[in-house]
Amino acid sequence: MKNILFVTPTTTFDNGAEISIFYLMKYLVSQGYNVFSVCQEIPEPQQDEHRKHYDEVGINAIYLPAAKWWWEDAPGGQPGSKAHRVESYRRNIKEIGGVIEEYSIDLVISNTVNVFQGAVAAKVAGVPHYWLIHEFPEKEFAYYLDK
């Protein structure tokens, strides 16, 4: 295994999940792995800063436009229509599948329970997938109590 793709929950360094995964990716690069990360596309000044940090340590960042990066029930609102979000999810799964194929990805790792696109794309491509879940069952999943 040489090529690993991470699905990153946000295109920031604002939270523990993003910070910890950055250091894991950096470590894997130092061990000779080819590391790729798909993130949600954001406005240029912030995205350029994000890319700079990734470039400095050899992480290949791929930014994808998305109506909503986290799954439908996750926090963050529901921008646009449901049809628009569903189409965006489908497009992102297809794009991630394209990354898996183009770079001969051996393993896909989703870095939060809130991003599902990598799991679906990996399954379709027949590539192993791991989920690094940082959330706790209590409080952080309160939005599921009504379901």
Regions found by a protein language model. Give the residues of each.
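An amphipathic, basic-hydrophobic alpha-helix
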Residues: 70-107
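Nucleotide-activated donor-dependent transferases that construct or modify glycoconjugates
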Residues: 1-20
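A short, histidine- and acid-enriched strand-loop-helix "catalytic/donor-clamping" loop
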Residues: 69-71, 116, 127-146
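An aromatic- and histidine-rich active-site surface loop
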Residues: 107-125
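N-terminal strand-loop element at the rim of the active site
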Residues: 8-14, 27-83
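Histidine-anchored nucleotide/phosphate-binding helix
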Residues: 21-27
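Conserved donor sugar-nucleotide recognition element shared by glycan-biosynthetic enzymes
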Residues: 17-21, 89-92
